[in-house]
A protein has these predicted regions:
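Single conserved hydrophobic/aromatic residue that forms the stacking wall/gate
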Residues: 1-14
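Repeated loop/turn-to-beta-strand initiation elements of outer-membrane beta-barrel proteins
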Residues: 18-24, 49, 59-64, 71-73, ...
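Transmembrane beta-strands of outer-membrane beta-barrel pores
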Residues: 19, 26-32, 57-59, 66-72, ...
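Surface-exposed beta-loop-beta
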Residues: 30-98
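Membrane-embedded beta-strands of outer-membrane beta-barrel proteins
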Residues: 51-53, 98-100, 135-137, 176, ...
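A beta-strand-loop signature enriched in Asp, Gly, Thr, and Trp
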Residues: 96-155
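Outer-membrane beta-barrel "beta-signal"
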Residues: 208-220
Length: 220
């Protein structure tokens, strides 16, 4: 019985100790192509090589990510100016991301904070640099209730510099949500969001958008 208690105490202490994690993966968008020039690990694989290193606890943490994208690999962005076709050149990209979060010891007026920043450097392209960033805040147990409030704002991946005149940076996009616990098994999550008018210098043009959504979660 004493040994079991000590093991439990050690386990509780270990949960608060910082942990180091690492991950590495490779995806080839053209991995199943019939041409022998494509496939995996070739110059025309449209490959993504991603590595990530993280360190932290349940209360705080940070992660550094790196991605090498070959010609034709997608960026996952709505801004057309960032998307570059292969053409006759060898376009590739070096991409870096830094993310972190922090939670207060006790819930209250001070929120938990999430931060993220990404930067891309393109070679063989008219676009030279692109970046993205976001800030997220969350208040748990608002006013001593089981509900939580979250707010986030930032900018999607956009062109920072290019050949010729650099485009204007997009305006802020934001969203807010309330996690409302109706009962032990039912939660309502109403949310609102705002997307600014698209910047024509970023390769797209469109009107601003304001919307709302309600999600219902059932647990059995």
């Amino acid at each position: 019985h004493l040994r079991t208690r000590r093991q439990r105490q050690m386990c509780i202490r270990d949960r608060g100790e910082p942990r180091l994690t690492a991950a590495l993966n490779y995806v080839a968008d053209a991995g199943e192509a019939e041409s022998s020039a494509k496939g995996m690990f070739t110059a025309e694989s449209k490959g993504n090589t991603t590595a990530q290193l993280g360190y932290g606890t349940k209360k705080w943490g940070a992660a550094l990510g790196y991605r090498y994208g070959q010609c034709g690999a997608g960026f996952g962005t709505a801004y057309k100016a960032v998307k570059q076709s292969c053409g006759g050149g060898n376009v590739d990209s070096q991409n870096f991301a830094l993310n972190g979060f922090w939670k207060p010891e006790e819930t209250g007026f001070i929120p938990s904070v999430s931060l993220a920043y990404g930067w891309s450097d393109l070679e063989g392209s008219t676009v030279e640099e692109a970046q993205t960033w976001m800030v997220g805040l969350q208040w748990d147990k608002v006013a001593n209730t089981p509900h939580s409030l979250a707010v986030g704002f930032g900018a999607p991946l956009y062109v920072e510099s290019q050949d010729g005149t650099n485009p204007d940076a997009p305006e802020l996009a934001w969203e807010a949500s309330l996690k409302y616990k109706v009962s032990k098994n039912i939660t309502l999550i109403p949310a609102i969001f705002y997307l600014p008018e698209s910047n024509s210098s970023q390769g797209v043009s469109g009107k601003e958008q304001f919307g709302a959504v309600v999600q219902t979660v059932f647990k059995f």
